């Protein structure tokens, strides 16, 4: 089955997957080609029959979510935005930049005149490099008014000249830094109508839910702690909110389609879980619906049968867990690369495959395969002794009363519940494991 996936820079990728493939299979293949390990930040979008932008559920079959027949057209988009310093890979940072650039030029992110001047200079630097009077001015008008005043143009030129020698990657990072400080950074907007039929925009972001008019002028902001419950019924989404008086109020939002309503419901639940929770709960992970065939099979055959099961949410990790997972993956990739590299060979990318051969003279009687196996065991042993929170210090603390021993002393002191079983921590006991750093630092060869 063929899928056409468009990147934020309008480059089209052809992706071939199995006929029964889930969305995750397609996204993983795209990210693998781009060299991206931090897959959890991204998603695949498509356009519904009524023009609504919808997220593909990565845990369900692609063919069951799309209209028509293959090839299917999808868009690679950033689903969860994080602070630039939390992005570990330059490839990931570049896709973030492309998405942000597209949003800026489309007017989805509002910036002040001062920010527009600075961003115009940075965007020109990423596109053309150092200032050149023959080419740079054509990109200055993208963010500022079409007819630039001489003072505005001079300000942008001055800023651009100050960027001389700045690399494209550095300029892209500075763009992300500026945009991440904006009020609407990381907010996903949904077009709705209220109970009276008035057109509104609902923004779902890291801090809560924003209700705005069509021109983005704010009406109300709802923080996640005061949201009791979000539910969906047909084309409607209901939000139960606690008022300052302590009473509850139910807000009704009407969507253009049932799938659009499902998209808003998913956005509220998944965004809250990603940014505000320590881990994704099983209540979110395991929520699903069944089609008629699957429902009948579950009644007469087995309640746990997977036939006809469609998951409601596809989020697997929170922001903290994504960062930790990516750090471990990059660390592991770097260790494998160091093991497989000859002493005489030049430094290579930390993501380079470990297929390169090791000279037999360095194995000292062991075969190359045996050496790699032993090095892999050593790597796993060293990783197992690291704190699961910071991934830097050795494990030396036990949570009581549950008994899990997975953190260093400094991280354990900051946790109120065990990161493994989620039980409450009454106190932390320092422990002395039968290991020593010097032992783990021994090399096999």
Swiss-Prot record:
Activity control note: Can bind 1 iron ion per dimer. Iron binding seems to decrease LDLR degradation activity.
GO BP terms: cholesterol homeostasis; negative regulation of low-density lipoprotein particle clearance; negative regulation of neuron projection development; nervous system development; positive regulation of protein catabolic process; protein destabilization; protein ubiquitination; regulation of low-density lipoprotein particle receptor catabolic process
Classification via InterPro entries: Band_41_domain (IPR019749), Ez/rad/moesin-like (IPR000798), FERM/acyl-CoA-bd_prot_sf (IPR014352), FERM_2 (IPR035963), FERM_central (IPR019748), FERM_domain (IPR000299), FERM_N (IPR018979), FERM_PH-like_C (IPR018980)
Biased composition regions of type Low complexity, renumbered to the chain: 350-363
Origin: domain of life: Eukaryota
Binding residue positions for Fe cation: 360, 363, 368
The name this protein goes by in its record: E3 ubiquitin-protein ligase MYLIP
Span list, region Disordered: 341-363
Keywords per UniProt: Cell membrane, Cytoplasm, Iron, Membrane, Metal-binding, Transferase, Ubl conjugation, Ubl conjugation pathway, Zinc, Zinc-finger
SMART domains reported in the protein's UniProt record: B41, FERM_C
Recorded catalytic activity of this chain's protein: S-ubiquitinyl-[E2 ubiquitin-conjugating enzyme]-L-cysteine + [acceptor protein]-L-lysine = [E2 ubiquitin-conjugating enzyme]-L-cysteine + N(6)-ubiquitinyl-[acceptor protein]-L-lysine
Region described as Critical for homodimerization: 431-433
Pathway: Protein modification; protein ubiquitination
């Amino acid at each position: 089955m063929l899928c056409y996936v468009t990147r934020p820079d309008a480059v089209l990728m052809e992706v071939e997957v199995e006929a029964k493939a889930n969305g995750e299979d397609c996204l993983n293949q795209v990210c693998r080609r781009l060299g991206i390990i931090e897959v959890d930040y991204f998603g695949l979008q498509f356009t519904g029959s009524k023009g609504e932008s919808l997220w593909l559920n990565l845990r369900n079959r692609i063919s069951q979510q799309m209209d028509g027949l293959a090839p299917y057209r999808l868009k690679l988009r950033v689903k969860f935005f994080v602070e630039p310093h939390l992005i570990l890979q330059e490839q990931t940072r570049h896709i973030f930049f492309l998405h942000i650039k597209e949003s800026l030029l489309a007017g989805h992110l509002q910036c002040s005149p001062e920010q527009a001047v600075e961003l115009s200079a940075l965007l020109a630097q990423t596109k053309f490099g150092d200032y050149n009077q023959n080419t740079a001015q054509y990109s200055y008008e993208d963010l500022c008014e079409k007819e630039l005043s001489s003072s505005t143009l001079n300000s942008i030129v001055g800023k651009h000249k100050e960027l001389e020698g700045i690399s494209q990657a550095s300029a892209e990072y500075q763009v992300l830094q500026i945009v991440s400080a904006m009020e609407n950074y990381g907010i996903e907007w949904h077009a709705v109508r209220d109970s009276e039929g008035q057109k509104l925009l609902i923004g779902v972001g890291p801090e809560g839910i924003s209700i705005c008019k069509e021109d983005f002028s704010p009406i109300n902001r709802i923080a996640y702690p005061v949201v009791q419950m979000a539910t969906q019924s047909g084309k409607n989404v209901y939000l139960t909110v606690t008022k300052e008086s302590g009473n509850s109020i139910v807000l009704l939002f009407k969507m253009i389609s049932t799938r659009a309503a499902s998209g808003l419901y998913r956005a509220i639940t998944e965004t809250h879980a990603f940014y505000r929770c320590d881990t994704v709960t099983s209540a979110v992970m395991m929520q699903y619906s069944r089609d008629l065939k699957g429902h009948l099979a579950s009644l007469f055959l087995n309640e746990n049968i997977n036939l006809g099961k469609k998951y409601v949410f596809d989020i697997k990790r929170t922001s903290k867990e994504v960062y930790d997972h990516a750090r471990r993956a990059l660390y592991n990739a770097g260790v494998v690369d160091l093991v497989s590299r000859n002493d005489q060979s030049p430094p290579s990318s930390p993501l380079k495959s470990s297929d390169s051969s090791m000279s037999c003279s360095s194995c000292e009687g062991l075969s190359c395969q045996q050496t790699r196996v032993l090095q892999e065991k050593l790597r796993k042993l060293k990783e197992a002794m690291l704190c699961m929170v910071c991934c830097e210090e050795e494990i030396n603390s036990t949570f009581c009363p549950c008994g899990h021993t997975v953190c260093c002393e400094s991280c354990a002191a900051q946790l109120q519940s065990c990161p493994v079983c989620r039980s409450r921590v009454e106190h932390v006991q320092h422990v002395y494991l039968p290991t020593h750093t010097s032992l783990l630092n021994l090399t096999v060869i």
